[in-house]
UniProtKB/Swiss-Prot annotation:
Coiled coil: none
Keyword field: Acyltransferase, Cell inner membrane, Cell membrane, Membrane, Transferase, Transmembrane, Transmembrane helix
Membrane-crossing segments per the record: 21-41, 51-71, 85-105, 119-139, 157-177, 189-209, 472-492
Pfam families the record matches: CN_hydrolase, LNT_N
Protein name from the UniProt record: Apolipoprotein N-acyltransferase
Protein EC: 2.3.1.269
Main location: membrane
Pathway linked to the protein: Protein modification; lipoprotein biosynthesis (N-acyl transfer)
Subcellular location: Cell inner membrane
One GO cellular component term noted in the UniProt record for this chain: plasma membrane
Occurrences of domain CN hydrolase (ranges): 221-461
Amino acid sequence: MNGYFRLIAAFALGVATVSGFAPFYLYPIPVVTLALLALLWRRSRTPGQAALTGFTFGMGLFGAGVTWLYVSLHDFGHMEPALAVLALIILCAYLALFPALTGWITAFRHFRASWAWPGMVAALWALAEWLRGTLFTGFPWLTVGYSQAPASPLAGFAPVIGVYGLSLLLMLSAAWLACWLENRQSHRFWLGLGSVWLIGFGLQQIHWTQPEGEPVTVSLLQGNIPQNMKWQPEHLAATMQIYAELVQESPSRLIVTPEISFPLFYEQAPQDYLALLAEHARSRQGDLLIGMAERSSSDNGYYNTMFSFGTSPEQSYRKYHLVPFGEYIPLKPVFGWIIDVLHIPLSDFSRGGLDQQPLDLAGQQVAVNICYEDVFGEEIIMQLPQASLLVNVSNDAWFGRSIGPRQHLQISQMRALETGRYMLRATNTGVTAIIDERGRVLEQLDMFTTAGLHSTAQGFGGATPYVRFGNSLVFALIGLLLLAGSLAAFSGRRKTL
C-alpha cells in the first residue's frame, strides 16, 4: 500500500472510530476500524512504519473526538484561536503516541509471525490505554472500551474487568478479524471472536448486586447558567434565585445541585439562604447537596466541594482528582503563565483526600464524585461496596454544544456498569440523567434547559468483581497474554497465523 494512502486510511479509521462513542453509540464500528488498523500493522514493512500508522490513527481519533477542547479553550477560556488549535494539536499528538507505541512493538517480525499475535496486540493496546489514563494524572477519555457501553455484548464484562478489560477484548476481537481478513481460509478466528461475545452476552444476564431497601425519591437540578455569565457578580443574585426556586419545587428526599452551583465561597454564602434551602430538605425528611468552593482553614488554598444540608448531620466531599490546567497548574514554574492566558476562575484548587467516605444522605450511602473524577473507575470503587448510590455533579457548560457532554454521559454509564450501582448526574447545562445499575439511561433532561429531574433511584448493595479487585484482573490477563506472546515468539515454535 502506498505510504500516503496508508496514512490517509489510518487517519480516516481514527475519525470513524469516534462514531462508536456517544452520542452515536454505534458500538460495532470500532471493531471494524480497529481490525483494519491491525491489518495495516500486520502489513507494515517496518516497526517504524507501524508506529507512524498508529500515530496517524490516534490523531484522527483524538482530533475528531476531543474537539470540545477547542470550545473550552477558545469560547470560554478566551484563548486566541491559533493558540487554542495549537494546544489541541499538541494534546492529540501526545495521546497518539500510545497507539503508535502499540503498533511499533507488535510489528516486530518475531511477534507478527506468532500464533499469539492477536493476544499480544490486545494486551499492549489495553496497557497503553491504561498508561494514557494514568501518566501525568491521566487522560482516559475515548478509551475504546467506553464505546461498548451499555448495549454491546462486551459490556457484560464491565462488572468483571472494567473499561480497560473491555478495551482488551475489543482489540482482541479486532485482531482476530484482521487475521481472518488476511487469511480467509482459516475460520478458527471466528470461533474465538464468537465465543468472547457470547460469553459477554451471558454475563449481561448476571445480577452482581442486589437492591437494598426502598427506592429513594431524587431531584437532580439543572440551573442552565451560561458559562460566560456564571462568574459575573451582577448575575449572582439571579443564579441563587434560580436554584432557590428549583430546590423549593423539588418533592424529593435527595436533592442534588451541580458542581459549584454558586460562584462564591461557602464562607460567603448568605446563611439565611442556606438555612431556607436546608429547611425545605428537612421538610421532606431528606437532604440537599450543594456545590460551592471552600477555603482551606490551614493555608491559602481552596477546594471544589459538595456540602450537605438537611435532616442528616452536615457533611462534605472535596474533589480529589483535579483537571490539569483547568483546576490546578502542574509544574507552576514552567506552566504558570497559562493562568494568564486561559482566564479560568478558580484555576488552582487544592486536592481533597483520597480516602473520603460515602455521605449518609436520605437513608442512602452516597459516593459523590465531581465532574472529571468519574473518568477514573479505579478511584470511584474506593467508596464501595459501602456506597449504595453514585452521584456525579458536573459543569459541562465548558463543552458548549459539542459532543463532549454526551461522551461524559457514556463514561458515567460505564461507571454504573462496573459498580452495579445507580449513577445520578446533576449538571449545570446537561446531561442531567438517572442511570441504572445496568448502565441504561432511565430519564434525562433536555440540555440547556432550566429544570429539575424528579424521579426515584434504587440503592444497591454487594460488590461486582471489579469493585472487589479493581484493575487487578485485567492486569493479570494482560500479563498472561504478553507472556504467551513472548514465549511463542522466541521459543522457536512460531507457528504462523
